[in-house]
Amino acid sequence: MKKLLIALMTTTAAMSLAVTAEAADKLKACWVYTGPIGDFGYSYQHDQGRLDVEKALGDKVETAYLENVSEGPDADRAFERLAREGCKLIFGTSFGFMDPEVKVAKKFPKVMFEHATGYKTSDNLGIYNARFYEGRYILGQIAAKESKAGVAGYIVSFPIPEVVMGINSFMLGAQSINPNFKAKIVWVNTWFDPGKEADAAKALFDQGADIIVQHTDSTAALQVAEERGLKGFGQSSDMIKFAPKAQLTSITDDWGPYYISRVQAALDGTWKPGNVWLGIKDGAVKMSAYTNMPDDVKAMAQATEKKIVDG
């Protein structure tokens, strides 16, 4: 069983599982991540949101997180552990955490829970998501313009609604530019495994794709594109520093404002379980700088982005 790692971040900087007398008066907000916060992708961006909470709310809050939590029995234990250790608001950030959160939320009715990308709610469990498909439509348009082969390699994690939605949106965007555009797909059945992601990228390039897309969390696939002199897109975070010549753009997740608002609601006593779906218009989904592409392609992407914002 993968060992659960916990880090408790306080303004005094020490890492500890103990709650001090001073911290006892604070609201303790906690996060559970399926990957490491150093993935520079999905889990990293959620953790940046946690840090935004600390900066915005200061000594009103105490935060903690668990990283590298497997979806399954480990998740049950992770959520229960945090609830028992005094977390009053707990965010689960992976689709596979849904049933564990439902189970633990029922067991701890006085604790507030939120689950990202899921669909099950209860009196003390809300859900939240972002319209990542909006960004994937733009990626598809760019890919169709930039790919000489008319073929993208698409690395995907698990066959869940969020991932399938992303594939469909990407292809709709691509085929709005080139009706004959195709994508070759590799399912790696993991959110974060740099080795598998790199191998998948190499295989897709070897099979004729000349641009890479991913719904996994590491920078490995984009780095393969950089090594081969090909193009690709970052995922969840701006990965330009890992592939300065290969990255065309990246869908970036900005969870900070949402997390701040929900923790503030918990502090105010106004928190209620919600069903929130944020997008480009709300600033939760952002496109990083459009780079390594002609001006006309950049203008096309910016125009599509504006249309999405304008509705």
Segments (PLM) and residue ranges:
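Bacterial N-terminal signal peptides
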Residues: A7-S16
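Sec/Tat signal peptide C-region and signal peptidase I cleavage site
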Residues: L17-A23
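A residue-level marker of the well-folded mature domains of exported/periplasmic proteins
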Residues: A24-G311
